[in-house]
A protein has these predicted regions:
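Non-catalytic pre-domain segments flanking phosphatase-related domains
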Residues: 1-17
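A metal-dependent, Asp-based hydrolase signature
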Residues: 28-97
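A generic alpha-helix surface/boundary motif
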Residues: 26-27, 58, 111, 153
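Asp-based phosphoryl-transfer active-site loop
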Residues: 12-29, 182
Length: 188
């Protein structure tokens, strides 16, 4: 993409990443669903959402509900075996060295975002929180759903909090729910 040269272009200071199929080479909800024995059902709901039959929020609620009863130890096993996108470790080392603030803004789950944060040193993680009771997923989530609009809102809030002009931000993602964030970032 061509961009107008200027001081803001040369001094990017915040970079926000999607997680699933961006920092990692999988969709965590599919991994969880396969372990819960509901992989086909979850993929069917995802396809309905992609066809526009249901929106992201509704598809999210339906897919999370199918995870009810899954033991949290499965999440730990999936986390330590996540297929990391090639170059993430080197990229994070360089971004930290040059002073970037880094964030994961994901429609996935905080458990896995926090794993990547501790492994690679991300500054922030915003994702969806799965509700757990007695060591099992309840099939519910807590807090606000992180969808495309929420990602854009979080990017704005991080820029304000870090006192960074939004033109000095970068957003990286792979899907339709990343478009709002990509559209408002200085580079997306």
């Amino acid at each position: 993409a061509f961009q107008k040269d200027g001081i803001f272009r040369r001094s990017r200071r915040l970079i926000c990443f999607d997680m699933d199929s961006t920092l990692i080479r999988t969709e965590v909800i599919d991994e969880l669903a396969d372990r819960a024995g509901v992989g086909e059902q979850v993929r069917e709901i995802t396809e309905r959402a992609m066809r526009g039959e249901i929106d992201f929020r509704e598809s999210f609620k339906e897919r999370v509900a199918l995870l009810k009863g899954l033991d949290v130890s499965v999440m730990e096993d999936i986390a330590v075996n996540l297929p990391i996108t090639e170059g993430v470790d080197r990229m994070m080392t360089i971004l930290k060295r040059v002073g970037y603030k880094t964030a994961i803004l994901s429609g996935g789950f905080t458990y896995f975002g926090n794993y990547l944060k501790s492994r690679f040193g991300f500054d922030y993680v915003y994702a969806n929180e799965l509700e757990v009771e007695n060591g099992k997923l309840t099939g519910r989530y807590t807090g606000e759903i992180v969808d495309g609009q929420r990602k854009a809102e979080l990017l704005r809030l991080l820029c304000q909090f870090e006192n960074i002009d939004i033109q000095q931000s970068v957003a990286v993602g792979d899907g339709a729910n990343d478009l709002p964030m990509l559209n408002i970032a200085g580079l997306g």
